[in-house]
């Protein structure tokens, strides 16, 4: 892009107002301006000053590029412009609709390109309207945007399977779904090769011309900014400087470089901090003291249980004797086993496990949403977790006794016991899966205007679903084992027969029960393992 000397001079010009004059400027929308920042300051904690006395104006329809190294404050400045970050000093006004393309894109990688673009319209519709899908008109609009960014052939491809450049285009299309007048692009080409970086910057420039957008981009490559930007500013240590490196300050103000710097990217801030010393307990003397303390605790445990080596003298002969009694010594012992009744009780055991686990999943799902710190109300999280700890404390056999007393003997008591036991563990598995989700996509949908339920439905649940389903399969597996002993207290299943055979010391028949349960568990384990692997690779 060739420019005259006058245009080059204009690129280097920065509209800066002094703190004194900024206070006297009317906050009404000025003609020709899209964004105005006055004496802008932003701190993270007490030590990190991300922005220091930044004043500038962005005109409608221009492309303003912000240059600067990592940690210079580019992300923080864009965050203040979008309203995502609240300045600690000064103010910034964006006079029309703003959309942001984040450096880390913040796309839901488990969802298709089309669905991710549709997420851009979440702020325009109620939670109920988008609970089961999006309006047809919005889908047509999203397809048009994907076609405009060159991804018409990738509509239904999960974003996680797209290349870096393609994902960047999806993020651009999602921003366009918000019908912005101002587009903020935070390092839009940071992870791309030179060819793709040029293509993305060219696309952004074309979209600006086509749609009359005001474009503010934070870029670290000076060549790209010179090729596409109308005006270039530079940040260093949170302060505004000119492109030739000279300080840009107000005529009557003096500023000093801050002792610490940072920006809105928390990872960058953490990298800039000094390395933390190893904790005291990991140093050699402290570690030795911990090791000695652990040894003392174990000695105390053994002495308290009165475990003596002489108790092991007959252990091996005793084990072999028991194993020998398990195996039949005559064919008649096998014939006498009530095989039809055993197989019927085995089917009942599997049925109890299936229904009990399913009920547990249904109950655990909303409880996990309440217990997850990134989803539920903060004032409820701790209370729900305390209740869940109490539920997990009760063994499944005790739950069975409780429900036998409540509903009587039979499989219903077993089903209720398995569901109660499952809730304690599944809820923990689920809320841990919710909390492990990348916070970027839910945060991005929140900026768009999505409600809490919309963020959960469209960003948290898709990412957590593989882990949640995997946990449910594991629980079903476990419940088959647990259900096989609930019959001991007459709560249904094959456990009734196991108890009967052990009471009459019919060990071969008890072994037959355990063997058919083992076969079912092995088959179920093989199937669930394959399913879990497929879920993880989704």
Q: Residue locations for each model-derived region?
A:
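Helix-to-loop junction immediately C-terminal to a conserved catalytic motif
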Residues: 82
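Catalytic Walker B motif of ABC-type/P-loop ATPase nucleotide-binding domains
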Residues: 183-186
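H-loop/switch region of ABC-family ATPase nucleotide-binding domains
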Residues: 219-220
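N-terminal, non-cleaved signal-anchor transmembrane helix
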Residues: 262-358, 370, 374, 378, ...
